[in-house]
């Protein structure tokens, strides 16, 4: 029998059987009915690799390649391992240990002398990846064969978190890998902790995208994710005496063991240039700057399923011919490599600073790169599956494109460009296809987050796309005029101003005269008697005043902008909000004019989070309790079963186990805090946590001012009075402030100053500690959330679209304090009003409250004035907080007048915190509240959300592999 042996550049997953590729491996067995591999060397060999074998893997495609016979003296016929065809990567511990040792030797990233934790992690990850590749190839070979409709999820962020524990857990290989690593002198948890968090996202937007991918795979939906491969991420946060400092992320410094570079999957991306007519009469975009987007694939495994989907990340580079060798050899090294740098920098940093024109251009390049590369790839895959008979009308029947916020909105003109300019379709046909294919998820009601781009910049950078956008805008104007007519010019003008894609741009020439307002009537003698000046009197008055005429200041023309949210609404077939209250605000306020025109487009899809990562894997203590008490582990896939805990909420045995699990998780956080900050905290104190992006609307400022008030009151009491009045608390913050967001960075600085003062006050001791955990990420969240007892979700009502951390906290038995905002509303409904601490103004009150403030009618509460005065007393150091506290002062002006209503909600917040203390003193009551939160969180699984997207927006079906 012909065999193929593993070479030093192998993954270790190639078969040594009569099969010619990974694709054929997963589609058929060999003659004897078994899968045979030489993956795991049987002998206990020295781990020093041969120098000639130190090559890195580059799997270029999943297509079959010609058979090959390569000999390797290291492996002989006695070393074959027979693995079951159902799960070829579910071997025993001995086989897994051999696999890990194999990768330590033959896919090394470290020197061969020592086999220590970092090397153990990479070898283990490569071993697990072998399993993923097998299932991954099986998944897409089957999808290609049955040619199913597929969803493509485009997002600027994917905040994945560590992959090793998640992959091993989803594959059901915890025991095998745990035992194997013990044989090698390691434990799985320590090895997994070596993995850096991928720096591909920042906040809830990216984490939601990653939860969705997990659910898509777990539920067997055919789907891909598309994003960018950021070399340095957002930034690594350091906390110093000056507050937050930013440094480049180094997550790729030792490479990423999960990704597979697809050098054969690359697409040209163009910027600048000009638009001309080709010889066929069709428009062509030529000249300008050309770069290449290269695919890096990351397998995403489902839980207890063979389905493994793909996250395709794009990296950018310049074509080799753009390297100016002549300039380089003449000593002009920087000039020679300029094109290379300009291409590569597109994927350097997530959300580069955009205060400069160059920064804005870079961000726009990022967004277009994501859209263009992804759509070229999607179109190519559609054509391949269609064979030689491509019917473009079927494109929306095979492809669904979901835009995660407005960042990928250039998908709309880009798909139009591809269909018209490259595939020869008419405008009408291309527009119908585009609208049926694309859908848009709105994530915000904040005006600054509803993206707008300078028309001038876009015309320069993407001239063909601006032509297409102008045409879409013209068609929109035609629709608006047709809908509202010209009888009421004021109404028509109002609608056009609100709904057009192009802002502050003259109407298209075809509609230049559509708004005709009545001319003023001539003044009659009767008018003159009533005090109205005649034309002659006006001329006389004007003549008398000519001598005193003042030349007016020149009017500054407002900038011409492209409104991406409007383009997303017009160009797609569905628009969804991400929580019930948010979707109502979207319909009633943000896009109300569009709702009146196309009500069928708008819907709600309340966010969710994956219960695999956010309970099952990050909180094994709680997971075991849930499984034991409801009698099945099926809740991991069917979270509605968690609701069965409600009937045991008062059971003393359950409550005792529940508190013990929480204590174990708190002890882990005690160690984390000591390691990251140097502070020692008591595990017996309440853990009060707010971890999220630092932003004024999320109101970390309200939280820390509440802590300041608490501290002030403590200082006014004797020791015995303090202990009687207050429950011991550890108040934990985490989150990053954008590098250019000055006010958010001031909040970080203020929190750390308050922490330094309180934590070093011997009178307070363990009664109150304030901790800011630096460089917050998914891995930190996986420790903090299971240990949390109170979590703060206190945004100004109506400003948080949904939030997902509130769901994670609730799942883990944490009681929430918050406003009626975002998903808080639905969480409170599910867990019970008595198990949620509610305070603050409601969303429908906010406009009037701001109006009252502007009119000088707001009277601040004395406690709020007391706190501000205390902050200004210098108790927290010599730093000035005038700018920070000044934002809470006055009645009008940019950056003032307490826009986020911290002062308005402060007394309600303090009163609510007193109720928290009261409830926590009764541990039986508190534990019941905790259990009811977990039991009521079942709705907030991303599995439910993805089922809704699949049914209502994407129209895709679940596809189980045979």
Swiss-Prot record:
Biological function: Phosphorylase is an important allosteric enzyme in carbohydrate metabolism. Enzymes from different sources differ in their regulatory mechanisms and in their natural substrates. However, all known phosphorylases share catalytic and structural properties. May be not required for the degradation of starch, but the phosphorolysis of starch may play an important role in water stress tolerance.
GO molecular function, one term: 1,4-alpha-oligoglucan phosphorylase activity
Stretches for region Disordered: 525-552
Main location, first listed in the record: plastid
Location of the transit peptide in the chain: 1-63
Phenotype caused by lack of the gene: Small white lesions on the tips or margins of fully expanded leaves.
Catalytic activity: [(1->4)-alpha-D-glucosyl](n) + phosphate = [(1->4)-alpha-D-glucosyl](n-1) + alpha-D-glucose 1-phosphate
Family of the protein in this entry: Belongs to the glycogen phosphorylase family.
The EC number(s) this enzyme carries: 2.4.1.1
Protein's UniProt name: Alpha-glucan phosphorylase 1
GO CC field: chloroplast; chloroplast stroma; cytosol; plastid
Location of N6-(pyridoxal phosphate)lysine modifications: 808
Gene that encodes it: PHS1
Protein's GO biological process: carbohydrate metabolic process; response to temperature stimulus; response to water deprivation
Needed co-factor(s): pyridoxal 5'-phosphate
Alphabetical keyword list: Allosteric enzyme, Carbohydrate metabolism, Chloroplast, Glycosyltransferase, Plastid, Pyridoxal phosphate, Transferase, Transit peptide
Pfam families for this protein: Phosphorylase
Localization per Swiss-Prot or TrEMBL: Plastid, Chloroplast stroma
